[in-house]
Amino acid sequence: MELSKWIIEEAEQLGFDACGIANATVLEEESVHVEQWLEKGHEGEMSYLTRNKEKRYDPRLLAEGTKSIVTVLYNYFPKQLLGDGKHFKIAKYAYGADYHDVLKRKMRQLLERIEEQTGKLLGSRIFVDSAPVLERAWAVRCGLGFIGKNTALIHSPMSLTASRSQHNKEELDINPTARRSRRQCGGSFFFIGHLFLPLELEETGKPLPNRCGRCNKCIDACPTGALETPFHIDARKCISYLTIEYKGSLADHNPTAFDGWMYGCDICQDVCPYNRFSLPNTEPEFQPSEQLLAMRGDDWKKLTETEFETLFKHSAVQRAGFEGLKRNIEFISSGELRDAVHDNE
């Protein structure tokens, strides 16, 4: 356990909000849920999710020699919302620099420290939303949270989730990493990263029980009905999928239902009671530029490709591309026009 504890402490020193370790094994139960989801075609046009499934379920096939999974969480909750918070909205995770680059850089530092501590060149793999890895499943296995009804990982440090002193003791025993959250922030606005290590490390936590209870705020709030049932999302109806991954026409959808979201969507997270524990992130690279903060409705409608490249040069918004974002802007604008006509009738 000494090395495991040391890794968690080093992760904390590097600025990660939580860290946990689990043994590399087959995700049998999780694979059943994924297969059922795929059978329904709810992945939409994300065909990459149907490939390399064996590697997705068994990390040892993805990175030969892997014995332990180190999972880290990094807070991205912003200090302020872009624009007026009502029109032409961007998901909070994309306010600043591309999280893939930021997290991988920090995780390389963690790996270098582990290699220095062990005296071994480990040749480990770093994954940040860029390979067939069931990220949230491993975060749960590492004791860093539970999956909410909105399918997001909800990080719940011991002090936030335990309701009674006896429960405090029980969760501390189950989940010793819980108390290591730097600022005791919780909720779902976290990036997830993984180190696949060829080291046999002691596990530092166990899966937490689901704590959604009878709350259905996320399901009730989804304007497109993407959350058909608890813990299940139909990507084909999801605003995030439609504005980022989907490349076709949005003509068959109701622009008003998109509620002003032009890249991604945070509705099911914003309404989650656990996100009252969110705290503003302190990562300089996640802060939006002054140019982005100054953008308003007319600016978005007149957006040029040159302006797009300036605003989102190192941003995750590049995944949608200029043409994709323009499509979304025009689609949302058509809804505003429709609403204006309706109000004047």
Please place each PLM-identified region on the residue numbering.
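Auxiliary alpha/beta "docking" domains used to position bulky ligands
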Residues: 1-211, 250
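Generic recognition of stable, solvent-exposed alpha-helical segments in well-folded globular domains
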Residues: 2, 6, 105, 109, ...
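Iron-sulfur cluster-binding cysteine motifs and their immediate structural context
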Residues: 13, 26, 217-241, 258-285
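Short, flexible, mixed-charge acidic loops at enzyme active sites
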Residues: 82-87, 235, 302-305
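Structural motif
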Residues: 244-250
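Alpha-helical scaffold domains
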Residues: 250-345
